[in-house]
């Protein structure tokens, strides 16, 4: 089984058209294998209009890849960051202005805290065999500096609160402790009054002026 280097360098790079195939490698056999980082970017109505709703088919997958490739080409800022260990793609983190994610905007559990124009992290994926080695935390840290360069005032994540162990399939938005270790702070607890079937989430934030703790083994370029 492949493992991330203990003493090597973890490189974190913006998603580009040439790296879309690397995202597919990361997402394979994970929660996002059929999502292609589009779950929160479209409402159900928009998914139907875009031809990506319903059961996954080869046509659906090709269409989702096409949409992610289009996002990777935009000039105002990458749609995410890709992590590499010794040149091997090992992680992907979705990133962008909150307005890029209609499903987040509509979510009661992830409602806006204030009027700060934040960027958000709706999904974090690390390949099997590379988990538990700090890849996710390094990617979260990297979002703050990257978003700041693009003019973002802050970055937010909507994490599972600390406490009961979270299954990997339910941790795609990260955990509270993960964000804390990346230098984020909790600015709101679980929204009260939500239906029991809602996934509990806490809002974590780092401002552009925050200096997240960085690892000497990771770099972004």
Give the role of each language-model region.
Residues 1-51, 210-221:
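Conserved N-terminal entry element of GNAT/NAT acetyltransferase domains
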Residues 169-177, 182-183, 188-221:
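C-terminal "cap" of GNAT-fold acetyltransferases
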Residues 35-79:
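Active-site rim helix/loop that mediates acceptor-substrate recognition in acyltransferases
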Residues 140, 147-170:
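Conserved GNAT acetyl-CoA-binding A-motif
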Residues 37, 66-70, 74-78, 84, ...:
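Conserved acyl-donor/pantetheine-binding loop and adjacent beta-alpha core of acyl/acetyltransferases
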Residues 123-126, 132-149:
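Conserved acetyl-CoA-binding loop-helix of GNAT-fold acetyltransferases
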């Amino acid at each position: 089984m492949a493992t991330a280097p203990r003493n090597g360098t973890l490189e974190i790079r913006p998603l580009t058209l040439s790296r879309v195939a690397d995202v597919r490698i990361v997402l394979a056999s994970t929660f996002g294998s059929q999502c292609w980082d589009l779950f929160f970017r479209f409402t159900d109505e928009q998914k139907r209009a875009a031809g990506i709703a319903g059961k996954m088919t080869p046509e659906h997958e090709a269409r989702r890849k096409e949409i992610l490739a289009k996002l990777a080409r935009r000039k105002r800022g990458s749609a995410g960051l890709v992590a590499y260990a010794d040149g091997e793609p090992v992680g992907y983190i979705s990133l962008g202005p909150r307005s890029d994610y209609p499903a987040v905007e509509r979510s009661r559990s992830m409602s806006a805290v204030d009027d700060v124009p934040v960027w958000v992290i709706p999904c974090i994926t690390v390949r099997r065999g590379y988990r538990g080695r700090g890849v996710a935390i390094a990617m979260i840290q990297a979002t703050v500096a990257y978003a700041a360069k693009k003019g973002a005032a802050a970055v937010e994540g909507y994490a599972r609160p600390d406490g009961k162990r979270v299954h990997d399939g339910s941790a795609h938005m990260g955990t509270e402790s993960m964000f804390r270790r990346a230098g984020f702070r909790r600015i709101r607890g679980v929204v009260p009054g939500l239906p029991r079937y809602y996934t509990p989430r806490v809002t974590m934030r780092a401002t552009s002026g925050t200096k997240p703790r960085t690892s000497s083994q990771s770099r972004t370029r």
